[in-house]
From Swiss-Prot:
This is Cyclin-U1-1. Interacts with CDKA-1. The keyword Cell cycle applies. Pfam families: Cyclin. One of its GO terms (molecular function) is protein kinase binding. It comes from the Eukaryota. The gene is CYCU1-1. Expressed in roots and flowers. Expressed in the shoot apex, leaf primordia and young leaves. Keywords: Cell cycle, Cell division, Cyclin. Belongs to the cyclin family. Cyclin U/P subfamily. InterPro entries: Cyclin-like_sf (IPR036915), Cyclin_P/U (IPR012389), Cyclin_PHO80-like (IPR013922). One of its GO terms (biological process) is cell division. PANTHER family: CYCLIN-U1-1, PTHR15615. Signal peptide: none annotated.
Length: 210
């Protein structure tokens, strides 16, 4: 399970080029800020309603990890080398979950596990080369068995709707850029590569989940 320890206490990941340092893409800063606001709002709602809902129980940890969302996303990016677009698409998945299951809240107990699961699935859809579940589990601080279960749970919660058209992708980029401008976080999302081909409406999951 994801520990409640700080980010410096998460197990170091040993893998091909795992120690290579790369500048953190701006989009990670924006998404972490948006997710922190969402979690703060939902924590307040949970206190009012005295519950988180049941749809996301598979993602709940025993307690909230102390590693921040920003540091957690940076860790995923550093070790998995997935493209920045994977984080945008992962955010799309979480937004779809929020709309499809409004009674189940993204809170501190589940946000980290949701993020690593969403980004991993997005990498399988978008990136030509990606690490397997076992590696993502080590990076995310969860067991391989738990990550496998969470992946399947997420796919069913989304009705396997994990393709994202370029138009939808672009609209989320504009939304994130607006958030950035409102909060003076960063200046642009230019580091996200064009995704017309890999995010085309014709994209399918036949090679992954059939």
């Amino acid at each position: 399970m994801l520990t409640a320890a700080g980010d410096d206490e998460l197990d170091p990941v040993v893998g091909p080029e795992s120690a290579t340092e790369a500048a953190t893409p701006r989009v990670l800063t924006i998404i972490s800020h948006v997710m922190e606001k969402l979690v703060a709002r939902n924590e307040w709602l949970a206190k009012q309603t005295k519950g988180f809902g049941k749809s996301l129980e598979a993602f709940h940890g025993v307690r909230a990890p102390s590693i921040s969302i920003a540091k957690y996303l940076e860790r995923i990016y550093k070790y998995t080398k997935c493209s920045p677009a994977c984080f945008v698409v992962g955010y799309v998945y979480i937004d779809r979950l929020a709309h499809k299951h409004p009674g189940s809240l993204v809170v501190s107990l589940n946000v980290h596990r949701l993020l690593v699961t969403c980004v991993m699935i997005a990498a399988k859809i978008l990136d030509d080369v990606h690490y397997n579940n076992e590696f993502y589990a080590r990076v995310g601080g969860v067991s391989n068995a738990d990550l496998n279960k969470m992946e399947l749970e997420l796919l069913f919660l989304l009705d396997f709707r994990v393709t994202v058209s370029f138009r939808v992708f672009e609209s989320y980029c504009f939304h994130l850029e607006k958030e950035m401008q409102l909060n003076d976080a960063v200046s642009s999302l230019k580091d996200i590569q064009p995704m017309q081909e890999s995010l085309s409406p014709a994209s399918t999951l036949s090679s992954l989940y059939v």
